[in-house]
Amino acid sequence: MTQFVGAIDQGTTSSRFIVFDRHGAILAVAQKEHRQIYPRPGWVEHDPLEILANTQEVIGAALARANLTAADLAAVGITNQRETSLLWDRETGRPLCNALVWMDTRTDELVQRYRRDGGQDRFRDRTGLPLATYFSALKLRWILDNVDGARAQAESGRALFGTIDSWLAWNLTGGPDGGVHLTDVTNASRTMLMDLATCRWDDDLLATFGIPRACLPRIVASSDLHGTIRTPPLDGARLAGILGDQQAALVGQACFAPGEAKNTYGTGSFLLMNTGTEPVRSKAGLLTTLAYRFGDEPPRYALEGAIAITGALVQWLRDNLGLFDSAPEIEALARSVPDNGDVYIVPAFSGLYAPYWDDSARGVIAGLTRFSNRGHIARAALEATAYQLCDVVAAMEADSGIRLATLKTDGGMVANELLMQFQADMLGAPVVRPRITETTALGAAYAAGLAVGYWSGTQELRDNWGVDATWRPTMPAELRAHHQRSWKKAIGKSLGWIDRPQAAADDVG
């Protein structure tokens, strides 16, 4: 009897497999981290074969812990780190190079060249996205231009392009022996190659970026029967859901009505608001993106505020500065001081994303005195997450005309109660943590389960959602205003830090 649904959650730092029951409760979970590869400053890579091996390992471990087999699963869904891009040989299954991670900035020179003719928003009307190092099109262009033989193989169709969802789906459904090469609308919308209105690859964009159509995956719905898994230990299970991680969290938080929003605190942070069946064009620095598409229903769209570095700042304090041994320890260190000591951190390690979109911004620690100590640095790091989200919320309210009444949250950092209270204080609005915080994986499970009738519809998914904790604002308005002014001053020190060389004369489009 197929009593459960499985979800592969392939993230920036680790791969997980989670088994959910009909109420969205977790039956079993297994997780394994993969290496972060930094060949040069600004370059970030992952080994696709390591990710694939880890994914298969955690699937087996989770099933074993629950004493289950593939036959016990009604369906399996995939959710993944978005934009991270790779090219692989369809005959051997070997990647042509490491995957270029979403936060990798090596395409900065290409971005500047394309901006010369039409500016940062040159393609925004069609794609919903500004020209930035974040998105997949120029990552693929870089691979085609810099990896030996890549362009010829891509043009012939021997090399296949994909984000991580495509890579996993292709391998799970057979790989070189008939694996399906596809991606869902949410992941496709992050490539800068898809027309938002049609949900199809756009020939003009392909020509402009120099991308051969032969290497691209087929674009499919987020919730549908995509294929049968043909590799152990899920051999025979149905692959029926694919969602980019932030869209998956939107689904997992049951944000199915226009105006409903969630924020995920992870390596970066991502605020998404459902805008319904029509895309809303941002005038305040947000992204217009796909929210999801269930079967033959019209696609749903979202506004997104993407923040590159939040949880990654905590990792940096741990790994590069050695302020603590494990990430959760930052809360105790931050609580060792009563306030931030007027220290502010702008973690622009990969430039600044929404609403600034400045690839030349760099990280800043401002306000240091001899009084400043480790506790102040830790507290400022947590507060930086809240300040960045407030910037995005202000932009989203300006675009949507909707005042955020309550913030639904998820992701690893929601366990940090000091951060959650400070977030409520800075927003001036309640912050809510749901009972089930693994909403990214849950969203992928929901998409898969809906496709096979395991759940009857979105109302049943709404009924699964419930509140675990709520934080309400208590900060005096004068202190909030002081923090806002100081944060804006620190942002000003970060913007435009890199002096750009004169762009090359050759025209790329």
UniProtKB/Swiss-Prot annotation:
* Keyword match Transmembrane: no
Positions of ADP binding: T12, R16, T267, G311, G412, N416
Query: Which pathway or pathways does this protein act in?
Result: Polyol metabolism; glycerol degradation via glycerol kinase pathway; sn-glycerol 3-phosphate from glycerol: step 1/1
GO MF annotation terms: ATP binding; glycerol kinase activity
Where does the chain bind ATP? T12, T13, S14, T267, G311, Q315, G412
EC number(s) per entry: 2.7.1.30
Activity regulation info? Inhibited by fructose 1,6-bisphosphate (FBP).
Q: Does the keyword Transferase apply?
A: yes
The protein's matches in CDD domains, at most eight in alphabetical order, are given as: ASKHA_NBD_FGGY_GK (cd07769)
PANTHER family, per this entry? GLYCEROL KINASE (PTHR10196:SF69), SUGAR KINASE (PTHR10196)
* Similarity comment: Belongs to the FGGY kinase family.
Check the record and name the NCBIfam families matching this protein: glycerol_kin, PRK00047.1
- Biological function: Key enzyme in the regulation of glycerol uptake and metabolism. Catalyzes the phosphorylation of glycerol to yield sn-glycerol 3-phosphate.
Question: What is the protein named?
Answer: Glycerol kinase
Source taxonomy: Bacteria, Pseudomonadati, Pseudomonadota, Alphaproteobacteria, Sphingomonadales
